[in-house]
Regions:
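An amphipathic, basic-hydrophobic helix/alpha-beta surface used to engage anionic
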Residues: 1-36, 64, 74-77, 83-85, ...
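Alpha-helix initiation and N-capping motif
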Residues: 36-39, 55, 139, 150
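Mobile active-site "lid"/loop adjacent to the S-adenosyl-L-methionine
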Residues: 27-32, 40-46, 129
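Short His-Asn-centered micro-motif
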Residues: 78-79, 102
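Von Willebrand factor type A / integrin I
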Residues: 67-73, 85-167
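Von Willebrand factor
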Residues: 38-73, 85, 104-108
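Residues that cap or flank secondary-structure elements
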Residues: 53, 81, 144-145
Length: 167
């Protein structure tokens, strides 16, 4: 939905709109263009896409985009950014383009049950595991680790000069 809103906003500003959907490889690429029909196609592709693969390789997607875009562009990256950032590839992209990172978060991932056994599934790999939370200290440790990872991510984006928005 965020991608659709951005596409309509760019179209209203008379900017070209393109799309790259990726997992471990680029699954869908739509060259930038103007026009209502084009934007509607991009929105349809965003909302109707079902990934063929799991995982996500931001480095590979950025390399693909850098080869595709010869002119300076605005690149909006929508991701959860849970995997380590490809710093050198982002630096290259930042030198040539205006890069904005929009981090999509899930409120359910920010909550844990008070105590007990929980089953977790990695959405990208499909791997399933169980964790037993025995006390509040384990829950506090989980949230501390998440907060530290988020702080590190924000520091990396700031160091790269990339605007970062968390939704």
């Amino acid at each position: 939905e965020v991608g659709a809103v951005l596409a309509f906003a760019a179209q209203r500003n008379n900017d070209k709109v393109g799309l790259t959907l990726f997992t471990e490889r680029v699954e869908k690429y739509v060259s930038p263009a103007k026009g209502n029909r084009h934007v509607l196609r991009v929105v349809r592709d965003i909302l109707g896409h079902t990934p063929d693969h799991r995982g996500g390789d931001l480095r590979h997607a950025l390399q693909h985009l850098q080869k595709s875009f010869r002119r300076r562009s605005v690149m909006v990256l929508l991701s959860d950014f849970l995997d380590p950032l490809p710093i050198s590839t982002l630096q290259q992209a930042r030198r040539r383009h205006d890069v904005v990172a929009i981090q999509i978060t899930d409120p359910h991932e920010e909550q844990l049950p008070a105590l007990g056994r929980i089953t977790l599934e990695d959405a990208e790999s499909g791997e399933v595991g169980e964790v037993t939370l025995r006390n509040g200290e384990e829950i506090d440790a989980f949230f501390r680790q998440r907060a530290e990872a988020q702080d590190q991510l924000e520091q990396q984006f700031n160091g790269l000069g990339i605007d970062h928005i968390r939704l």
